[in-house]
Amino acid sequence: MIQEYQLRVLPEIAANEQRLKEYLSEEKGLNLRNINATRILKRSIDARQRTIFVNLKIRAYINEMPEEDEYEHTVYNSVEGKPQVIVVGAGPGGLFAALRLIELGLRPVIVERGKDVRERKKDLAQISREHTVNPESNYSFGEGGAGAYSDGKLYTRSKKRGNVDKILNVFCQHGASAAILADAHPHIGTDKLPRVIENMRNTIIECGGEVHFQTRMDALIIENNEIKGIETNTGKTFLGWLAANGVTIEAKGIAVGVRLEHPAMLIDQIQYHNKNGRGKYLPAAEYSFVTQAEGRGVYSFCMCPGGFIVPAASGPEQVVVNGMSPSNRGSRWSNSGMVVEIQPEDFISGELKMESGELAAQQNAQLLAINPLLSNSQLSTLKTQLTPLHFQEELERQCWLQGGRRQTAPAQRMLDFTRKKLSFDLPESSYRPGLISSPLHFWMPDFISKRLSLGFQQFGRTSHGFLTNEAVMIGVETRTSSPVRIVRDKETLQHVTVRGLFPCGEGAGYAGGIVSAGVDGERCAEAVANYINQQ
């Protein structure tokens, strides 16, 4: 007999299967000897009160043995000789699109500007060691995309539960722990995810697909408003090419701020209401904050308990930071993005203007180099479309200047920031390239710094001990999502003016994390299959 139960137990019971069996036997009147195994289907922590509980949904196998695998297998057959589909980018959107195309009997050919996930690791080490950034292989570009070496966090707010479960099961099929199927906030870990990504690539190749690394798509070949192919490794900038050649794009809202790092013990003490921290049976504590400050959202983003802050620049003259956590979340620090919502209209008001005249001239020159026939009116329109991107680039450059023109990051103690004081020293940090004390409140746009300060003060009121000089703000967090969207039809998922082009995933402006990008990749693969079947 197989029975499912909802349980509310202490952490030490949830962490030990034998104790869980004993609890089940006592609470449900079962014979302990007849409970052969238990499987946790859902798990979440209730830390609202001083006594912490773990909510479980479990499956008990009574006088039966459990099935061997805890996840559902997807069958991938050979697609040798099948119609070919070019997939640009080997991030989660591209990888899941490719796997879904194979399911649908189509042959994916992936082109990826960066290196494979193993070779990429060497370039990441150079950023911290030598302060040099390879524009083609870094924390943003390469196999696995930005998520491969950031955190491996698989939480999404997507309401398409079936699609989310499919994504998690595919990860398990390729080597991820089945625990991700149960956890409320599933997490693979940046130490485990590269192997999973490598296995996904191997499945694609074994089925007859192709994966080409160090192959950057720079332009599209378009005839009569229909895509015919791509140009690679030409040196052009792709978004600039799209804008200059009339392929419809649009500015979208972004969120910009800092990485905030606390001692992990302090966050554990706050969240678990215990001066001794999390103890033996609880994971490093998470938090989530959101508030409104002068009409714009201020919120935590991609919180990494027991994690590290890493340099995420993708080119020269940039300092960008991101967070990551290993699977055990065992670091001495916990960090999170703390960002302010920015809408496209905020740039029009002029309050967010950072752009220098020299930079504006360079941007116009780049567009004219791609398309010399652009009029002043067209240049003005393109500038509006690309303004969030250019703002992001200029803020990252300012951060590089403030950091001493290296990957050293400008930083300020949290309480000092709210009091507009320069920090005379900084706490120890997980950020390996190093920190330099800097008045973030002074050089960051007032639109951002003012709202961050108000947000921090609000978070400090609701979570005693959170607003503290033990915490350090590290600049800047700018890559929460793409600042530009390649516009597609809501029903067909095809570009609004170019037939056969299906913008997909985070880079195209349609996702905000690993799982949402994977879900979007599968949806776009299905849309491509429908398009091909109608030809």
PLM feature spans:
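Residues forming the flavin
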Residues: 2-54, 58-149, 153, 157-170, ...
